[in-house]
Each structure stands twice: as C-alpha cells, then as structure tokens.
C-alpha cells in the first residue's frame, strides 16, 4: 500500500521529497495529495501555464515559483527532514538547498490548508488545454 501511495504521489507531479511533501499535505489538510492536488487547476501537478484558477491553484503557482528561485538546488530529488512543534512545521537543518526546499513545501502545504474552504472540485483533474491565458510572472 505504501508503494502504491508513493507511486501515486510521484505521478501527480509533486516535486521535492515526495514522502515529506505528501505527508505535510496530509497533516495540514487531512487530504491525500492524490487525488486532491494531482492535476488541480493550471499549476498543481507537472508543469504549469496560464492563470491560476483560484487560491488553491495559486498555492501551486507560488510553489513552482519558489522552486524556480533556486536554480542551484535539485527540488525534485533532494530529501529534507522536518518535525512539528505545537502544530507548526519546522524545517530541520541540512544543506541550504534542503532547508529552502522544505520551506517551499511547507508554504504550499499551509497554503492548501488555508484555502480548503474555497477548494473547487471542478478544478480537480483540470485539462491543461483550458489553461490558455497568458502566464503570470513569478
């Protein structure tokens, strides 16, 4: 079952340390990354183009921008460690890249939680072909 979950998370395009980011999302939202954030809107999942459809999609847009701001790091493969204190995610010390990747993932997971009330099922498994507007700059 754990292997299936790992494969599902990988297929949705979650970057960074798949296990840690997926766990953060579950802890913050009570929802599994798959299927809720697999291909939500124009930015959740692999790639991203167009204008974010809502605040949840904007979380993914900002997450993509965060990863893009660290060209010397490998957010798709670097593994980081974190723990929780009083309910808050604390990124542990590691390399500078690991810490920055963790902070990007933390911000996205918290953003997902903060926008649970406005999550729209109509944007879950949203076709890329509908993301036609000009992309915003980070």
UniProtKB/Swiss-Prot annotation:
Q: In which tissues is it expressed?
A: Expressed by the venom gland.
Which reactions is this enzyme annotated as catalysing?
a 1,2-diacyl-sn-glycero-3-phosphocholine + H2O = a 1-acyl-sn-glycero-3-phosphocholine + a fatty acid + H(+)
The GO cellular component terms are: extracellular region
- Where this protein primarily resides, as one coarse class? secreted
Matches recorded under InterPro entries: PLipase_A2, PLipase_A2_Asp_AS, PLipase_A2_dom, PLipase_A2_dom_sf, PLipase_A2_His_AS
Top-level taxonomic group: Eukaryota
Q: What PROSITE patterns does the record point to?
A: PA2_ASP, PA2_HIS
List the catalytic residues: 63, 105
Q: Which SMART domains match?
A: PA2c
Subcellular location per the Swiss-Prot or TrEMBL entry: Secreted
The record's remark on the cofactor is: Binds 1 Ca(2+) ion.
Gene3D superfamilies xrefs? Phospholipase A2 domain
List ligand-binding residues for Ca(2+).
43, 45, 47, 64
Q: Which cofactor does it need?
A: Ca(2+)
Q: Name one GO molecular function term.
A: calcium-dependent phospholipase A2 activity
Q: Which GO terms describe its biological process?
A: arachidonate secretion; lipid catabolic process; negative regulation of T cell proliferation; phospholipid metabolic process
Q: What is its EC number?
A: 3.1.1.4
Q: Where does the signal peptide begin and end?
A: 1-16
Question: Which Cys pairs does UniProt list as disulfide-bonded?
Answer: 42-131, 44-60, 59-111, 65-138, 66-104, 73-97, 91-102
Known function: PLA2 catalyzes the calcium-dependent hydrolysis of the 2-acyl groups in 3-sn-phosphoglycerides.
Family designation: Belongs to the phospholipase A2 family. Group II subfamily. D49 sub-subfamily.
Under what name is this protein listed? Acidic phospholipase A2 5
């Amino acid at each position: 079952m754990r292997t299936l979950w790992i494969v599902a998370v990988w297929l949705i395009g979650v970057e960074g340390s798949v296990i840690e980011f997926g766990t953060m999302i579950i802890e913050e939202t009570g929802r599994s990354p798959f299927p809720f954030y697999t291909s939500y809107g124009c930015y959740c999942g692999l790639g991203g183009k167009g204008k974010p459809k809502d605040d949840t999609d904007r979380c993914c847009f900002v997450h993509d921008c965060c990863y893009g701001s660290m060209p010397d790091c490998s957010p798709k493969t670097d593994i980081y460690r974190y723990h929780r204190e009083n309910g808050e995610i604390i990124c542990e010390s590691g390399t500078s890249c690991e810490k920055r990747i963790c902070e990007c993932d933390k911000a996205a997971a918290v953003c997902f939680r903060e926008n649970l009330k406005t999550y729209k099922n109509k944007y879950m498994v949203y076709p890329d072909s509908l993301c036609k507007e000009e992309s915003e700059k980070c």
